[in-house]
Design a protein with these regions (language model features):
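Hydrophobic alpha-helical targeting segments used for export or membrane insertion
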Residues: 9-13
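Bacterial signal peptide processing site
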Residues: 20-22
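Second-shell loop/turn segments in exported
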Residues: 40-47, 89-95
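Bacterial N-terminal signal peptides that target proteins for export
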Residues: 1-7
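Short, compact, well-ordered microdomains
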Residues: 83-119
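Immediate post-signal-peptide N-terminus of mature secreted/exported proteins
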Residues: 24-35
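C-terminal motif of bacterial Sec signal peptides marking the signal peptidase cleavage site
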Residues: 15-18
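Surface-exposed, low-hydrophobicity interaction/linker segments
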Residues: 33, 41-83
Length: 119
């Protein structure tokens, strides 16, 4: 009888832990020359990474997405040497959001002709 209670408790705790919708996830976007969803929200007199991240944050917040943090790094293997708007610059934007906002974020990339999307 004691072992049944123990296993029941373990199962209940396991279910409670696995169903946590407040978990955070990180989504990525390969920055383009001028085809990023938030480009209209970036108004910079002087360019800084913090100001650029703030523009991204402002855009996502206006779309109803809670942002935990934003970071970016250069991945030289993703650089596309062309001048078109859809060409990737090599900068990968990482956006940490609550798991429940993942679907909203993926919808923002929409159906674009270049196949750009959050991953």
């Amino acid at each position: 009888m004691r072992s049944i209670r123990f296993f029941s408790l373990i199962i209940i705790l396991g279910i409670m832990v696995s169903c946590n919708k407040d978990q955070a996830i990180s989504m990525h976007w390969d920055e383009t020359g001028c085809f990023n969803p938030w480009d209209n929200f970036i108004t910079l007199d002087t360019f800084t990474t913090e100001a650029y991240h703030q523009g991204i944050n402002d855009y996502l917040t206006s779309e109803g997405i809670t942002v935990n943090y934003i970071s970016s790094e250069l991945d030289s293997s993703k650089i596309e040497y062309c001048f078109a708007c859809h060409c990737k610059t090599g900068k990968v934007i990482t956006i940490n959001i609550p798991k429940e906002d993942k679907r909203k974020l993926k919808r923002l990339s929409g159906n674009n002709q270049f196949g750009l999307a959050f991953y």
